[in-house]
Each structure stands twice: as structure tokens, then as C-alpha cells.
């Protein structure tokens, strides 16, 4: 299913582990790749974790890097020029951009300047003034009014993501398309045998396992999560916290755990391509992010019947099953501890049918992608 006759569109997604990239790869796996396939635009010239997977599906990795330029100002100029040449030299006709207005509208401008006929802007982030710097806010506000002149299709994973990324008239007039973050639902179905095996392998058979998956950055609010767990551990000494992911704040969070003397109870698990098994081992999934467009991890956790505790800053579109509860970040940490403890006797079973009805089956999302882009390509 990797025909040379397949028509390709260019998508922006880093090829390391992450929610957006995982979603795009899952969609790609469900395409009829004899008809439509993805190529990937990356901004850094290095081998990444998921690169071999997409190359194996017939994709090309297209690099527009300026990492070889030391001067910061010149690096920016060089990156823009190389992006322009990338679009021009590869005769790109369709670009599917996963991003936000403050960081990615430059790519849109360059794409249009180079002759790209159709740009879809697909936003996954609901943003937050808590962690965004002033320059980012200023750039976002400056770019938004320009978007309708350069962007051909507006897609969002949630209403909050649309409000954060798109001009007001696009949101008010509902010009954007809601695209659920589809997953391979069956892969996450609850399985008691897998749960028991993974818990044995991890050495947490008799533990109350709290889980989290997310990049170590300010947005994900790991500091708050660790503080909540520290309070929980004082009341439940059988509790352990499994943190999946990597990122720039991982080391500082490890130092925080050491200061709290929780090294034996908080485990930094790194990245894995078997998260579906890790959800099985957990008892509660906690996500206190400052904001989320629509967290894929929250959908995956629900599919496995795992109770999910979210900050009320996270979009409500993820609230599909009876597994989900929300709490304000302004609440005392004792309220979070109490809510986590309330899940000890939660009845665990798969919720995949509920999620399928809500549109979170990656097969349905892939079908929409394919029909949409084949129709666009037919018109070009």
C-alpha cells in the first residue's frame, strides 16, 4: 500500500514521541495509501524516534533546518529562506499545518509565497496566559487578523483550541471544522491479564498507582502534580506516581522529587511506544495542565476504563465517559487528594463504544482526512 501513484500532502509534525505526531501516524496507518499519503516537514536535521515508522509507510522526511547557523538572528532568516525553498523545490501543493498562530503563521506566509495552493491550519492547543510569554501573546494577536487571507481551511480539536488560535469571526461564525483526536480504540480496551502482568513487571502489584503522560514543560504543570502526590503519599504510603514523557523540565522535576524525599515513590518512566499497556497498570490518571486543546492521553486513558482527573482548565470535549472528573487548580491540594482517593474502588471496564460514538475512532477521522484531501487535490 505504498504506491508511487499515491498523491502526497505535506504535514508539519516532529517525528519524536508526542500526542500530535502519534495522532498523525495513526491517521496515516488508516489511509488508503495507494490514494493518499503524508510527507513530513521537520525543522531539525536529526534522526527521531518515529522516523522509521513513517518512512516505512512510504513517507518522505523533508528537512528545512538552520541548525548549522550559530548566530540566532541569522538562523531565523536562514530557516525562513530554507522553508521557502523547501516548498518551492518540492512543488508542494497542499500543507497540513499542526500548530498555533504565534509560532507557525510564518510557515503559512512562506508556503503561500512559494505557491502552495491549499493550507489547512489544524490547532491542538488551547493556550494559557499563565505560561505564554509576552512576545508570544503579541505575535499571536498580530497574526490572527491575517489568517483568513492565507489559511484555506481551519480545523480544531476543541472549541477552546479554536478560540485560542483563530480570529473571532472564524469562531463566532463556526467556519472551522471540529476534528476529534482519533485513537486506535481497540488497542486500549481494558484487559485484566495485561494489567496484572504489567504491574508485576513494574513492581507495583500492591500499589495504588497514579499515572500521568505528557511532555515536561510549563504547560503540563508537573510541579503541581508532584505537590499533590506528596500530600497524597502522606495519607497513602502505598501510592506511587508514574510519570511518562520527556522534556526540558524533567531534570528540575527530578530535583524536586529528591527534595521531597519521594525518590522511591515517584518514577520517571521516559517515553514509550506501549502507553496502551501502561494505562492498564494505572489506578488513576491525573492531568493538572494549565491548558490543553484536547489531550490525546485523556482519551486513551478513558478507552481503557481508567478514571481520569483533569484540571478544569482543560477543554470539556474530552469529557465523554463516566471516567472523567474536573477540579479547579485553585482548589486546595487536599481536594485533589480526596478525589484521587475516591477512585480506589472504581469499576474498571472498557469505554471504547462511548468514545467511538463521540467520533474518537481514528478510522473515522482518517476517512474524513482522505475524502477531504482527495477532493482538494482533484480541484487543484
What kind of feature is each model-predicted range?
Residues 189-203:
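A short helix/loop element that forms part of the nucleotide-sugar donor recognition site in Leloir-type
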Residues 100, 271, 290:
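Aromatic "clamp/platform" in nucleotide-sugar-dependent glycosyltransferases that forms part
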Residues 307-311, 316:
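Short hydrophobic beta-strand element within catalytic cores of glycosyltransferases
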Residues 18-26, 208, 212-231, 248-254:
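A conserved mid-protein helix/loop that constitutes part of the nucleotide-sugar donor-binding site
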Residues 149-189:
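A short, active-site helix/loop in glycosyltransferases that binds the activated sugar's phosphate group
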Residues 241, 249-252, 262-272, 278:
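Active-site donor-binding acidic/aromatic loop of nucleotide-activated sugar
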Residues 10-18, 22, 26-78, 176, ...:
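N-terminal strand-loop element at the rim of the active site
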Amino acid at each position: 500500500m505504498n504506491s508511487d501513484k499515491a498523491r502526497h500532502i505535506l504535514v508539519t509534525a516532529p517525528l519524536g514521541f508526542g500526542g500530535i505526531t502519534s495522532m498523525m501516524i495513526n491517521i496515516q496507518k488508516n489511509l488508503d495509501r495507494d490514494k493518499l499519503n503524508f510527507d513530513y516537514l521537520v525543522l531539525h536535521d536529526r534522526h527521531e524516534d518515529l522516523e522509521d515508522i513513517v518512512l516505512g509507510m512510504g513517507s518522505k522526511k523533508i528537512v528545512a533546518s538552520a541548525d548549522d547557523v550559530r548566530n540566532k538572528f541569522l538562523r531565523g532568516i536562514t530557516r525562513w529562506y530554507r522553508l521557502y525553498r523547501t516548498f518551492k523545490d518540492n512543488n508542494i501543493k497542499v500543507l497540513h499545518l499542526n500548530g498555533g498562530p504565534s509560532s507557525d503563521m510564518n510557515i503559512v506566509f512562506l508556503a503561500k509565497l512559494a505557491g502552495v495552493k491549499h493550507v489547512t491550519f489544524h490547532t491542538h492547543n488551547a493556550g494559557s496566559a499563565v505560561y505564554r510569554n509576552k512576545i508570544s501573546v503579541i505575535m499571536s494577536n498580530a497574526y490572527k487578523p491575517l489568517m483568513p487571507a492565507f489559511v484555506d481551511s481551519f480545523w480544531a480539536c476543541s472549541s477552546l483550541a479554536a478560540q485560542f488560535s483563530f480570529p473571532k469571526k472564524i469562531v463566532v461564525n463556526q467556519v472551522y471544522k471540529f476534528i476529534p483526536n482519533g485513537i486506535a480504540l481497540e488497542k486500549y480496551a481494558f484487559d485484566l491479564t495485561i494489567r496484572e502482568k504489567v504491574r508485576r513487571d513494574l513492581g507495583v502489584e500492591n500499589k495504588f498507582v497514579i499515572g500521568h503522560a505528557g511532555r515536561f514543560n510549563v504547560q503540563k504543570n508537573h510541579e503541581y502534580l508532584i505537590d499533590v502526590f506528596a500530600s497524597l503519599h502522606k495519607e497513602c504510603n502505598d501510592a506511587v506516581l508514574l510519570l511518562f514523557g520527556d522534556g526540558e523540565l524533567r531534570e528540575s522535576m527530578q530535583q524536586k522529587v529528591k527534595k521531597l524525599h519521594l525518590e522511591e515513590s515517584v518514577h520517571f518512566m521516559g517515553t514509550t511506544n506501549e502507553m496502551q499497556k501502561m494505562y492498564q497498570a494505572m489506578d488513576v490518571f491525573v492531568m493538572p495542565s494549565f491548558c490543553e486543546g484536547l489531550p490525546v492521553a485523556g482519551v486513551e486513558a478513558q478507552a481503557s476504563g481508567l478514571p481520569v482527573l483533569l484540571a478544569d482548565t482543560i477543554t470539556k470535549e474530552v469529557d465523554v465517559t463516566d471516567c472523567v472528573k474536573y477540579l479547579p487548580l485553585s482548589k486546595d491540594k487536599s481536594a485533589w487528594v480526596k478525589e484521587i482517593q475516591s477512585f480506589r474502588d472504581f469499576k474498571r471496564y472498557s469505554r471504547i463504544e462511548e468514545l467511538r460514538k463521540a467520533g474518537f475512532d481514528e478510522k473515522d477521522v482518517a476517512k474524513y482526512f482522505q475524502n477531504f484531501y482527495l477532493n482538494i487535490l482533484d480541484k487543484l
